[in-house]
Amino acid sequence: MNRFFKPLALAAAAVAMLAGASAAMAAGTPSGTSISNTATVNFAVGGVTQTPVVATSPGFLVDTKVSMTVVPAGGAGSVVNVISGAVKQVIPYEVTNTGNLVNDFLLATANLASGTTFGSPTSYTDNFEASSCGVFVDSNGNNSYDAADTAVYIDELAPDASRRVFVACDIPASRVNADFSAVNLTATAASGGAANSQGAALAATTGAKALNTVAVVLADVAGSDDLANDGKVSARSGFLVQTAALTVTKAVGAYCDPVTPNINPKLVPGAYARYTITLANSATASTSATLRAVADTPV
């Protein structure tokens, strides 16, 4: 009886050992890396060590994980203060490649619908559209928008690397204090591998995994204006008009006249009239104003 149970027990032990073998993990491993694995069973029979039994599994290639983050440089929920009539006002963003392959990233910005609310801890409601908006990539790494920043897509962004991106818009001159324009930035993953050449947007590989090919897996999270696993991530921000709220009043009164120069002067022919111009910036205004000139024009 025992002679039949011993091989069975040995086989069961071997199965248990194989079942407990750890799986090869590919988290953080570069796309296209070849992974192989060998199982070795060391055993003895009757106290005598036997030749190890070795099994080699088929190798496989690590797939491409596509993911990224897009965050306003001022933090989630942040907005940028602007003044009415200003041009090339900038919202800086940070785009990070959280995937496992060098990628290009296509960039786009959009004005959000009127009535859109955004902001934290203070929430603002969109009531106008910024104009002439464009997206530009920081060219020299100084995190400031310069005339040399003309690239409109991110070229060859390595895994775990980040790049500063600017959404630049003009603010209409008619806007008043506390007006708000909500915008977003969307980054779409594209194929890399060719410097200074814009790649095509990546699409997920369909069907079962083939061990000897590299599949594309869209692993991005849902952004503010897109879905999860769609190869893109978006994030919102906006322009908040912060300007002076000036009022001007003009009063007139008799200063002196040739009949009664110093006693209750009247505005008779030959009299002098005094105009008083008063300027005020509202106590609730968001910023101060610099007085350049006051024109007093007779009509």
List each language-model region with its residue ranges.
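Bacterial N-terminal signal peptides
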Residues: 11-19
